[in-house]
Amino acid sequence: TTLFRSSLFGIQYPIIQGGMVWCSGWRLASAVSNAGGLGLLGAGSMHPETLREHIRKCRAATDRPFGVNIPLMYPQIEEIMAIVAEEGVKIVFTSAGNPKAWTGWLHERGIIVAHVVSSSRFAVKCEEAGVDAVVAEGFEAGGHNGREETTTFCLIPAVRNATTLPLIAAGGIGTGEGIFAAMVLGAEGVQIGTRFALTDESSASPVFKEYCLSLGEGDTKLLLKKLAPTRLVRNNFRDAVEKAEDSGASAEELRTLLGRGRAKKGIFEGDLEEGELEIGQVSAIVSRQQS
């Protein structure tokens, strides 16, 4: 933990709150940072100017370090990166893309870069790209996942053996015991999504939170593998996806079924039947909403 406290993120505890779409706004990120962890804003569901507003509000609410999570496949990536630099953000977590694309640019502006990977092969690519830390995420995680379907328990030692980069474990971690287990396996810190998505400060719909707190084992499933493998909660939309996949739907047909704004509809607006409900397997052991 010394590494996280002193040289890397300047935080008190080696706990990072995942920058999740529709959950990770300034209220959540600043609360986590104020508590001694690292809060991340989820740029994936924000228009560029919305992100600017959240960065400013987060900075007003905390004097501790915080960062921004940016999926590299974001359509207005240049605008988002420019805003992050203009607003003086010092920590960026990137995912869903090649870390080579932006790491150098971010480093030139004095920004620390961590990249999310789902395999040791990608972790090696991160090291080659010059990132400062790697987040190894097992497929227990909610939302988008890697194609390898490797569990966190198997992924952490594999990544630890493949790279000397500071290693952050993610996927299926939601308790103190889970954090300890990740560190025993070789991680220096953890990134937690689900547990923070279901807090008071999360910007997700109260209806979505309440529903996810009632889930048990087996209530989430990895689907949409022809597009980007995504862990989804059972509902009408997921049933339709499963039916389409079972009948051999093409990537194009699945894209049409997915449409636009499906995750917003589910997570932010609380449409439990037609929305895309993304949450991790660890939701099965989270039963109450906390601050």
Predicted regions and their residues:
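Conserved active-site-proximal phosphate/metal-binding subdomains
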Residues: 146-168, 174-290
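Alpha/beta enzyme core
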Residues: 23-35, 53-63, 74-168, 175-194
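Short catalytic-loop micro-motif centered on adjacent basic/acidic residues
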Residues: 16, 40-42, 67-69, 91-94, ...
